[in-house]
Each structure stands twice: as structure tokens, then as C-alpha cells.
Amino acid sequence: MRVGVFDSGLGGLTVVQALSRVIKGADIFYVADTKHAPYGEKTPEQILQYSLNITAYFLDEHQIDVLIIACNTATSAAVKTLRERYPELIIIGTEPGIKPALEQTRTKNIGVLATPATLVGEKYQDLVNVLSAKEEVTLYEQACPGLVEQIENGEIESGKTHDMLEGWLHPMRENDVDTIVLGCTHYPLVAHKIEEIMKREMNLIHTGDAIAKRLLALAEEKGYENRGKFSLCIMSTAKIDQEIIKQIIPEYDCFKFISVKTSNF
């Protein structure tokens, strides 16, 4: 099974981590589109174009069987069009884990950390409207501009990152939030900082494990055998620090810079 995974940067490697725990026989091709990061500050039209170009690259260069959009923002902007354009390709998107958050919260106060684009996206708004209509909960939504850049630059432990998180999380701490949805695949990389600032153990909802389970189920349904070697090739569209990659995924089979052809679809 050949699987293409992409994100605007390194955050999607948290999804690859989850895949590696349950998927055995798969060749994973990961594209970090660092040239255009962060997606959360781009227009939906731009994000759709990036997503179409990367998908075409995966199909032309690596003949993938499965595409995983390891980015909430790109899922919102592109998954519908990609499924229409490539009906034979298995496509798995990433959505904020509102449903599991509703199942796990005790205080009925839920925080959502996400990029600005995800919070205003139609897919997220529809999900919130449907699920919150069934449950009496209070959502504390917080856009986190600049956090992806801090993570990409290896500044997770910096004072600036701490101050940013402190400002965003203070209202949640004061309002007895016990569950926080990590609405961007980069954010699990600062999970320990979130718990430190919240000053208590939290339910932190990340969808990587759900994506891995979905892929395993689809693989079995399509007759792919879950055995053999798990291989990972990481590619980037711009310069990136491999030391940061190794902090997330210590072992991988290859790394290279690539140029994704820009096409007008």
C-alpha cells in the first residue's frame, strides 16, 4: 500500500506517528509544503490549488493508493474537490475532534485551538452546529496565529511560545475547560506546554489515531495485507531543519527537497 500524506509543514508528521503504530506494510510518502506554510493564513482558493498540485505530484511520481490530508485547513478547503476529481483514490481528511471531545468532557466546557482558516471554514462550522445542537456545552474557540511558525522554527520551548499559549489558554483555565480540541496537526507538538499552562491534566483531542484506524479499516476492506515493512520518505518544498524532523520522527528512510509542479486545474 502506497500512501501520500501532506501538510503545510511538519505538523502532519504527528499523523504519520499514529500510522506507524498500527500500519505495518506501507510505503509512506510525506510532503511538507513549507514553501507555502502556514496554510491557516492563506485563502481557500490558494490552499485548494496547493492541494491539487501535491496530489498530482503524488500520483505522477509515487503512484499512491491512498491520500491523507494531514491538515484541518486543507481538508476544509480541498477534500470535496479532490474526491470529485479522483473518485478511485482513497482520500482521508482531517477534522477537529469535536465529537470525541463531547464524549470525554465532564465539565461541558470545551476549548478549541485552531488556525484562523479552520475556525471560519464551512466544514468546521457545520460540524459544530450539528454536534453542539445535540449537547449542552460551551465552546471556547481560539485562533492561534503564529503558533505554526513557532513550531516549525523549533521554538516550542521559547518564552514567546509560552506567552502566546498563556494568553490563549487563560480564559479556558478560568472557565473550567477540561477538554481541548487540537484543531491543527502541529499542535500535539506543544501538548506538554498546554497541560503545563492549564495546570492540570487535560483531555487533549488529536485526530491522528482516528486517521490511523480509518486507514487500517479501509486497507482491510480493499484487501491490502497489513504486514511487511513500514517505510517513510519525507519531502519538503523548501528548506527545513532535519533536526526538528528527528525530534518528531527519529527514524525515516529518505529525505529530499522537491519542486511540486504548479498547474492550473
Swiss-Prot record:
It catalyses: L-glutamate = D-glutamate. Pfam families: Asp_Glu_race. Gene3D superfamilies: 3.40.50.1860. It is an enzyme of class 5 (isomerase). One of its GO terms (molecular function) is glutamate racemase activity. It comes from the Bacteria. Transmembrane segments: none annotated. The keyword Isomerase applies. GO terms for biological process: cell wall organization; peptidoglycan biosynthetic process; regulation of cell shape. InterPro entries: Asp/Glu/hydantoin_racemase (IPR015942), Asp/Glu_race (IPR001920), Asp/Glu_racemase_AS_1 (IPR018187), Asp/Glu_racemase_AS_2 (IPR033134), Glu_race (IPR004391). The keyword Protease does not apply. Keywords: Cell shape, Cell wall biogenesis/degradation, Isomerase, Peptidoglycan synthesis. SUPFAM superfamilies: Aspartate/glutamate racemase. Substrate binds at D7, S8, Y39, G40, N72, T73, T185, H186. Its EC number is 5.1.1.3. Provides the (R)-glutamate required for cell wall biosynthesis. Belongs to the aspartate/glutamate racemases family. This is Glutamate racemase.
